[in-house]
Amino acid sequence: MMYALFLLSVGLVMGFVGFSSKPSPIYGGLVLIVSGVVGCVIILNFGGGYMGLMVFLIYLGGMMVVFGYTTAMAIEEYPEAWGSGVEVLVSVLVGLAMEVGLVLWVKEYDGVVVVVNFNSVGSWMIYEGEGSGLIREDPIGAGALYDYGRWLVVVTGWTLFVGVYIVIEIARGN
């Protein structure tokens, strides 16, 4: 299971390398969608069925609409792929070489260390009350996001709206 998670993580980073090498918008959108699916599978691997499904439906659904619209507005007759130009190919190869170097370094030094500790999340923890029952952590986490992070949700929604508006204005040419 650890190797599957490791391969999924490598696939996620390689997807980001493929996107950051600035291919045509069609290929960039495809790579982001595939990376999003891999990220959702990683969440499912950690036992977050509810959160993985929500991320898949909301994030990927919105992304497919936005990228479908922008690629329709900015369609190219000959789209630039990763092997089309020397610059794009070199950037992909450098990114993949850095990922292979990181994988070998982690393998050599026997893992990674924990950098972030979550010490002050006591109010988000689930405590068992009287009686017996099954409580899943995923919906409780979504409830905590909307309860404690309500302003973060508002700012995120506004940012997504402004981002879509900017992309539409740029694609339209005004």
UniProtKB/Swiss-Prot annotation:
Protein's cellular compartments: Mitochondrion inner membrane
**Coiled-coil annotated spans:** none
User: How does the record classify its membrane topology?
Assistant: Multi-pass membrane protein
Record keywords: Thylakoid included? no
Outcome of mutating residue 72 to V, per the record?
Answer: In LDYT; most severe mutation with no vision recovery
Q: What class of enzyme is it?
A: translocase
Mark the transmembrane ranges: 1-21, 26-46, 47-67, 86-106, 111-131, 151-171
User: What is this protein called in UniProt?
Assistant: NADH-ubiquinone oxidoreductase chain 6
Q: Which organism is it from?
A: Homo sapiens
Q: What is the lineage of its organism?
A: Eukaryota, Metazoa, Chordata, Craniata, Vertebrata
